[in-house]
Regions:
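Terminal targeting signals and extreme-terminal segments of soluble enzymes
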Residues: 1-92, 98-156
Length: 156
């Protein structure tokens, strides 16, 4: 996916519905010496919500990996930290936008405090590949069908 195919900050902040959502605490092991979330932990949070989306779409992610059928490695990621998250904060992690191409998917993510403050926004791009050859393969039909018609989804 080319850079211009990613999502604008305004689009991420203004998204009205979540494609996947997960509530969780910021745990002690998630913060750094400054007492705020350690920067790579947000990617773990994004990944967990993304996995929830794939499972909701009916994809057998563990089985597909075990059978070496397909995988969707991350090829791009970015995050903007807008407000601090600290140990003990309760947050909601959302996948709010998606763009589905022939062999790739892009997602926009948000992490919000329970008071509605958006603390982190980010984007990830995944390319679907054969787990055996690592050559690109089409985005699974089940995922494309699940996302079709949802608010915030662009099917290319």
């Amino acid at each position: 996916m080319k850079p211009e195919r990613r999502f604008s900050r305004d689009a991420i902040l203004g998204a009205t519905e979540a494609l996947a959502s997960q509530s969780r605490p910021v745990r002690f092991q998630d913060v750094d010496a400054a007492g705020t979330i350690f920067f790579p932990k947000v990617y773990e949070y994004f990944s967990d919500a993304y996995l929830d989306l794939l499972l909701a779409a009916g994809l057998d992610v563990p089985g597909s990996l075990a059978r070496r059928e397909s995988a969707a490695p991350l090829v791009h990621s970015e995050a903007d930290y807008l407000a601090p998250l600290r140990f003990g904060d309760e947050v909601v992690v959302e996948v709010v936008l998606a763009r589905v191409g022939a062999t790739s998917t892009a997602y926009a993510h948000r992490i919000l405090r329970l008071d509605g403050t958006v603390a982190v926004i980010g984007q990830t791009v995944h390319v679907w590949v054969s787990a055996k050859t690592f050559e690109p393969v089409p985005v699974p039909d089940a995922l494309r069908a699940y996302l079709a018609g949802k608010v915030g989804v662009i099917l290319d």
